[in-house]
Amino acid sequence: DVTIFESGAIVEYVLSRHGGGRMRPSPDSADFPSYLQWLHYAEGMIMPPVNTIVVETILLPPERRNDENVNRATKLLSRMLQAVDAHMEGREYIAGEFSGADIMTGHACTVSKRLGADVSDKPNVEAYIERCNARPALKKAWTV
């Protein structure tokens, strides 16, 4: 039995052990560096401000919430999503075909929007979220 508790590590482990070469570019592919970058960008750059927003607006009791923390996190999240928007210009998925990087980044973008991040000025992010969420497996996962 194996226990892994970080989502990026879980995605890498599952794809390495059970992916059969699917859902990630091969290491010699031109898409592989982008795949790695965005696989880790989701948890390293998008999710920290998301987590701050969750803590400050949902988890903390009202008397302990700090609006300034939410404002800073919201601004940071907008910048992080702007980078995704720029990368997604002319692309359907992060690194060519749908991959583990899209599992991570698509989820981070979706959660950001569901928490109220304004993506109306980020049309590539908006379209990317819609594409990811239109995938049958993800539709099924959201119902569990």
What are these regions (language model features)?
Residues 1-68, 75-78, 85:
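GST-like domain detector, emphasizing the conserved glutathione-binding G-site
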